[in-house]
């Protein structure tokens, strides 16, 4: 792989890492929100939806980690 393509791939890795950090921040905020839902609402629809959102964000973070690793392997 030539230097130009490696440089382009590294730029993509940098962008993915930035997106991952942003997602992790949102995930943390959503988890804090979920953890502070009053006990009498914890069995409700809102709490269930919040749990689904947290799981989806976690999956998205993992996917970005996988993508970043794959691209970094290609660069080597």
Region locations from a protein language model:
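Long, low-complexity or tandemly repetitive, helically biased scaffold regions used
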Residues: 1-76
């Amino acid at each position: 792989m030539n230097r130009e393509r490696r440089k382009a791939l590294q730029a993509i890795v940098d962008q993915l890492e930035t997106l991952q950090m942003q997602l992790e921040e949102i995930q943390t905020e959503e988890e804090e929100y979920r953890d502070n839902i009053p006990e009498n609402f914890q069995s409700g629809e809102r709490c269930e939806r919040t749990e689904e959102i947290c799981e989806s964000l976690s999956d998205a973070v993992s996917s970005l980690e996988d993508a970043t690793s794959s691209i970094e392997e290609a660069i080597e």
